[in-house]
Amino acid sequence: MAPQGRLLIRGGRIVNDDFSQVADVLVEDGVVRALGRDLLPPEDASRGLRILDAAGKLVLPGGIDTHTHMQFPFMGSQSVDDFYQGTKAALAGGTTMIIDFAIPQKGSSLIEAFETWRNWADPKVCCDYSLHVAVTWWSDKVKEEMKTLARDKGVNSFKMFMAYKGLYMVQDEQLYAAFSQCKEIGAIAQVHAENGDLIAEGAKKMLALGITGPEGHELCRPEAVEAEATLRAITIASAVNCPLYVVHVMSKSAAKVVADARRAGNVVYGEPIAAGLGTDGRQYWSEEWSHAAHHVMGPPLRPDPLTPGFLMDLLANGDLTTTGSDNCTFNTCQKALGKDDFTKIPNGVNGVEDRMSVIWEKGVHSGKMDENRFVAVTSTNAAKIFNLYPKKGRIAVGSDADIVIWDPEATRRISAKTHHQAVNFNIFEGMVCHGVPLVTISRGRVVYEAGVFNVTAGHGKFIPRQPFAEYIYKRIKQRDQTCTPVPVKRAPYKGEVTTLKARETKEDDTAGTRMQGHS
């Protein structure tokens, strides 16, 4: 095989978020060097050059999965897709970058969590990656560490949990403080939007009713619980003019809240995930416990069968913006930790490998979106929001050569028997998808071709992300200038002012306060 690093992709239809064109792509040293019709390589590059025929195929920017949890210690277990297996599977699906989450325990250092995840990922990743960092508690130390992470460590996104009471959940005043700091340091705030107090009470109620199976998971976390928290997060973010990113939007109700806020001018982005776009929560009522448990995730899939189509509609029309997978996989034996109590089932599903094909099938093949919108929601919008653009999320001169040769007419049947993930089931089992990645190129190297990998652990790199992403902060800065309240200019009051008598007792003070309140 010719040495990697010099590639000429011939005759494909290059698809970016804003236009498509038939052209060749010349890649050298991991970067796109030239685009054009009937492109001839430089004479000194002709030797050792590999030519890939993409005639009749699409040439796409590699996918960016905005939401993964590889080898995540959670609910007494650890997700089985580690940073090697998970990123290898991502490449097979046409994804060339993931953004995972470093999540500290309450009271623990954010920076130490970040370094822990870096140490786990750096030697293993097969594709490029970055890290969001979670804020699970609040103090002056947390505030300072957020600043350090944004300034020195390449982190420009911080996630707050409104659920998982007693574990990761933060209160409204902590959300306000964290959002305020995000704005100060030029980061984007992310939220897991569910009302954790209502979930905790609902879970007790379900168990008291004898509902111990996976259906209890959805019953104690209904749509209203997600929608309420989504609106609350948007309200708090708006109060401090902080950009907000709502992860895993799972219900019609929550999606409507995001859509309404965007149409009202709020700087907010919604992220549906492959699971919510490709299947629904009727699975929780399966009489086969393991099948039902395989689908347990938070927020849950919704039993309304119209939900996936509704979310795809909003993704297609711009009310929702990006797509992730929330890939957090636990094998059946791990899910069985909750065989007698649904609250103990580790939350999480697969999706990092199948995200691109599921969205093509449900979005493009169905006629809801075109190829350009597909690129926007699977790659470009994420690159813009998280300040990776145009190095990522675009095929242009100077961009990283993260490229997928995509066959829009080919089909594949999703199955745990053939997928490349470590988990022993697949929530999309049996789904036939149009849209198949034939070749995946990461950092200028062909890493996956015709079902064969050519990649080793550590090929991928950590990609730092700078704060104050122009795509989101242009509007934030303008809103600061035009929407910040100002005092009314008026002449000073010069009339009589009543003199209050001194109060001698606490009771008099209280009574006086009441009287003043009614004056």
UniProtKB/Swiss-Prot annotation:
Keyword terms, alphabetized: Hydrolase, Metal-binding, Phosphoprotein, Zinc
UniProt name for this protein: Dihydropyrimidinase
Broad EC category: hydrolase
Residues with PTM Phosphothreonine: 510
Entries under SUPFAM superfamilies matching the protein: Composite domain of metallo-dependent hydrolases, Metallo-dependent hydrolases
PTM annotation (N6-carboxylysine): residues: 159
Highest taxon in the source lineage: Eukaryota
